[in-house]
């Protein structure tokens, strides 16, 4: 259930900046995207074993949420998310991109993500540590349509380009992830609706829950 006590918390502006963005590399990112189906991952066996092991541990750190399910499969035909090692050269595609790793997602007509592929050139990425770090980061981006922010100085956040490997998920990343899937809805909440909701919620106080549920219309 949505925690309405945190609607206007300090994380609201952070959430807005990571999800509702517009730049030269995107036609329009003002519509939030969520995974509309359980994410079933197939990990390419050509990815180094140590990297695969670290990634499976990382996935176990992702917060549990009623609107988001994730699992692994050993059968590629059962997966809707393929993480692949490639020998191809991978170029920059967006300002979020680094060479040698990228992802592409399939969405339905309600902007729900239903499938994806993450490609990485493990050899060109260099060290095992670099492979682990970037796989974690790019996979996390793909779950929530998040983007990196240069303003994040913390080495603990996956959304920082200064991120270093950790055995835990930062509170910052956890709150943003949970917030994103709290906003899960059949009809996406566009940028102007999000801003309107935030303004009205601050005015309504204890009646905020009723108002917010009306904004998350399933009709």
Per-region residue spans from a language model:
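Extracytoplasmic
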Residues: 34-38, 65-67, 76-80, 113-115
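Active-site recognition of the HExxH zinc-binding catalytic motif
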Residues: 120, 132-147
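Zn2+-dependent metallopeptidase catalytic core
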Residues: 50-72
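Acidic helix-start/capping segments at beta-turn-to-alpha-helix junctions
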Residues: 39, 43, 71-93, 155-162
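Disordered inhibitory propeptide/activation segment of secreted metzincin zinc metalloprotease zymogens
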Residues: 1-43, 47-49, 59, 206-218
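Sec-exported extracytoplasmic/periplasmic mature domains
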Residues: 60-68, 141-148, 182
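Metalloprotease/metallohydrolase-associated module, dominated by Zn2+-dependent proteases
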Residues: 103-126, 149-219
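Catalytic zinc-binding patch centered on the HExxH motif and its immediate surroundings
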Residues: 24, 30-34, 50-51, 88-114
